[in-house]
Amino acid sequence: YFNNLAQRKFTVLKDNTNPLLDVTFDGVHILNNDIVSPNPHIVIELNDENPFLILNEDIDTANFQIEIKYPNSSNWNRINFFNGALANLEWHINEQENKFIIEYNPLFDQDGIYKLRVQGQDKTGNSSGDEPYQINFEVIQKSSITNIYNYPNPFSTKTHFVFTLTGSEIPNKLNIQIMNINGRLIKQIHLNEIEDIKIGNNMTNYYWDGRDEFGDPVANGVYIYRVISEINN
């Protein structure tokens, strides 16, 4: 038999790479001071590229700091995972991608500006950034459609529609009717059937190309539009 011994030096480098933090509200990366639903689905993901240090569902909650500041308050309220944990807070691990996923479904019952602050760390202690992720968002309880306009205006080939939706429910009917100055309907657009409408600011992917219901170009001039919406009839 062989009785050989081989030795070789090797170096282990410390993990210095920051994990990636991603935060969405109802599937959207919101901008600062955007309007959101009073009961949003907030998803927080921490993605670590190190395949040798797998995040742990039970232990690594300590590596997160999630805080909310309510309207007219100067205090940050920490969201707890265990002692005093909220029923609307869940978390799990995607082991294949080494991703820690937190799902938070709060009910914000005050109108006003809220602040969310999040910081996460991987197993080595690398933070997701030098500063915590922080964003302001606004909650408006009343259901309304405001700030409606088409863009660009005037237009030559196509125009999109922009509007702000508030409240907690998406209308099950949201139509835009375009009429001439005599009030005759020339085009009806069923936005809820062709658009992914969300609470907050919306700009349609759909564009009106200046054609009527029969596909014929309309004459140059001024046209009027109105919005008809229904929530649960």
Descriptions of predicted regions:
Residues 126-127, 184, 216:
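Residue-level signal for well-ordered, solvent-exposed loop/turn and beta-edge residues enriched
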Residues 1-152, 156-158, 166-168, 222:
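Short, compositionally biased serine/threonine- and acidic-rich segments at solvent-exposed termini, linkers
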Residues 66, 118, 175-177, 208, ...:
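Generic short beta-strand
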Residues 31-33, 173, 196-202:
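Glycine-centered loop/turn motifs
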Residues 109, 113, 190-232:
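Short, surface-exposed loop/turn motifs with a glycine/proline- and acidic-biased composition
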Residues 48, 120-124, 180, 212, ...:
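Surface-exposed loop/turn motifs at beta-strand-loop junctions within extracellular Ig-like
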Residues 136-151, 155-182, 188-193, 204, ...:
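Glycine-centered coil/turn sites that cap beta-strands in beta-rich domains
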